[in-house]
């Protein structure tokens, strides 16, 4: 009986071998055969949308393999001829096979896939069990119809038993044009060589790949081999369009992300530190901040064992060991290890000084310089020496001061071998060469050090930014203000070791010590 138009069976896309042909295939060829059969099955099953379980009854007659099944009121009879071979059961007879189909469509598919692998797996044992026997035909048919595609299992009359099989419905959701409508030819050479590898199996494999992505997304152009995957993919586009910021129009694929983004506009900071009361817009920022209180430093450098609160700090630190400087200046080609360093450097080329002092109007290119300068007006000195309790407005000044106690002088002049406690004073080397690169544009006076030029230039500008809070007197240098301030406080930090007399200024102490040394003053 001819199959109705549009009906497709698994046999239509299967390659069938006789027992003799099968025994002549090597293990690699049998593995390839199994893979192709499994791939055919996957592509047929992918056309299904909502499968349900169905019980079918199979029987056979002595005249041949004649299948009779009942599904509702539908009945169909198909005749098949012996002599060809599709799948081999190695371990046991077909009547012991039981397909445990679950109501879940996916589980049902996996069960059949597992069974097919069993049927085509251990071929060596088949050769032992069936050596000398007549050809046995285990055919797995898979029929598709616009209303009721069915799964069939064919067997010889000796091994027929009731089988549990799966029926796949709703194939009408897929157009006939998307179904597989041709059966590939089987080519076997006389010597059972590799002809079939180069013909039928590879032809089928190519056809499978051509059919794999027949369902295409209109939005992104991405294609899938079944409609269910396409619908799942389309939810991504739906999600992207669902969550939109009503302030700036930016879109997100998660409601949580858009809620977090809106805090940038509203300034909301719902996460509060219980230690200091500081608030944050994200829990991640709060978690990182808490490490400052707990002292936790989970990120450790493998080179020097130095630890950090934040991962970003560790990444920057590692560049010290690697020498990496990924940020390059387009003007002069100089490279930097941090982006902030490059930003500050660029201002040397542009002349930009975005930080302005409201007290004196002086501008700065770096925020750190502006912060230090502002302490001149406020008198703030947050850095304190643990040895003598002296305070400083700059951290670098405290560092230099500590070397007075430790007598450390790490900077050495290559010309004369003299050592210094500050890197700036190392420039004393210019005294050997007589070099004076810093020249005043007003009077052409030159200096070896830039700091001396800046002090000199205040004579022309009459700039005295440093003011005494006691008497209102102004000075051009911080050191001058410091010395003047001792007149009000009576502080005398310089003490003679011989007579314990103290002085406000170091120069006065040096003059006093000449009494003991006998050194005469220069006239």
Curated annotation (Swiss-Prot):
Family annotation (Pfam families): KRAB, zf-C2H2
Location within or outside the cell: Nucleus
GO cellular component, one term: nucleus
CDD domains, A to Z: KRAB_A-box (cd07765)
Example GO biological process: regulation of transcription by RNA polymerase II
GO molecular function: DNA-binding transcription factor activity, RNA polymerase II-specific; RNA polymerase II cis-regulatory region sequence-specific DNA binding; zinc ion binding
Keyword tags: DNA-binding, Isopeptide bond, Metal-binding, Nucleus, Repeat, Transcription, Transcription regulation, Ubl conjugation, Zinc, Zinc-finger
Highest taxon of the lineage: Eukaryota
KRAB domain residues: 8-81
Zinc finger (C2H2-type): 215-237, 243-265, 271-293, 299-321, 327-349, 355-377, 383-405, 411-432, 438-460, 466-488, 494-516
Xref: SUPFAM superfamilies: beta-beta-alpha zinc fingers, KRAB domain (Kruppel-associated box)
InterPro entries, sorted: KRAB, KRAB_dom_sf, Znf_C2H2-type, Znf_C2H2_sf, Znf_C2H2_type
PANTHER family (UniProt xref): RIKEN CDNA 6720489N17 GENE-RELATED, ZNF44 PROTEIN
Family: Belongs to the krueppel C2H2-type zinc-finger protein family.
Biological role: May be involved in transcriptional regulation.
Designated name of the protein: Zinc finger protein 765
